[in-house]
Amino acid sequence: MKKTLYVSDLDGTLLSPAPEITEHTAEVINALTAKGEYFTFATARSIYSAIPITGRLDINVPCILMNGVSIYDIRNKRYLKTEFIPVEASAEVLKAFERNNVRCFMYKLEDETLVCYYSELNTKVMRSFAESRKNDYKKPFVQVDWLADHANGDAIYYTTTGPHDVLYPVKCAVEKIEGVDYAFYLDVYNGEWYLEVFSAKASKFNGIKFLREEFGFDEVVAFGDNLNDLSMFEAADVKIAVGNAKDELKAAADIVIGCNDGDGVAEWLSSAVMNNR
């Protein structure tokens, strides 16, 4: 019998529009893992927002965080793998933001603790992001005068959110920097765009490749909705897009299922996996 890993994106895919894990989704996934199947998630979220929002799920395989930057073992509360941004590349990334007068958050992994640095919160969206993370998830935020003074080799992620036309020039500059990759996509909740910059070695593709090799999976079934899930699809044997997915992802999918507002992932798992075991 094949050893299969089921891995789902969170926002827009496994999570409802609320966003939350519905009772039905929790019941299906927990029944799945109780029967010996393997389930995890791959997300752009960090540990601080991903772990609480999936708390009702029995995740039995380490998860992929921050678009593949880190592999985190939820059960044993430890990072298995993290891709750091080279110092020279970090300096160039910060210059790209500065030249375009765009502020960003810088994430660093310090003694197994994820810390978020920023210089100023100069937009309503950035202030809202910081306040929600501080209040809802108790994420450590540190304000400094210059991010460049603290980009000393343990930076793993740069992120910001705003209008497409404001972030696009930064994206164009970042894509020319050696040693980093990026994700640039529309947020499913507020209509703003996200720009996320990370090591060129980090991706959902490489995250799934690591899990496949580390745990000996014969097959990977992946669920997604957005452009940052394309690399995950490349690593999967079966590619499944939810009904609300971007057209580009649907075009790359083997199967299109129900939308996230109708527990599409759980419904498919229930009918295609649980009923056939």
Sequence positions of predicted segments:
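Mg2+-dependent phosphoryl-transfer enzymes with acidic/Ser/Thr/Gly-rich catalytic loops
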Residues: 1-5, 22, 194-277
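Asp-based phosphoryl-transfer active-site loop
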Residues: 3-19, 93, 233
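Active-site glycine-centered loops adjacent to acidic/histidine catalytic or metal-binding residues
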Residues: 9, 43, 225
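Active-site phosphate-binding/coordination module
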Residues: 20-129
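Surface-exposed amphipathic alpha-helices with a cationic face
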Residues: 26-34, 98, 175, 209-213, ...
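Short, structured coil segments at secondary-structure junctions
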Residues: 57-59, 67, 177-178, 235-236, ...
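Short hydrophobic/aromatic-enriched beta-strand-loop microsegments
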Residues: 60-66, 182-183, 239-243, 257-258
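Conserved acidic, metal-coordinating active-site core of Asp-based
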Residues: 107-221, 227
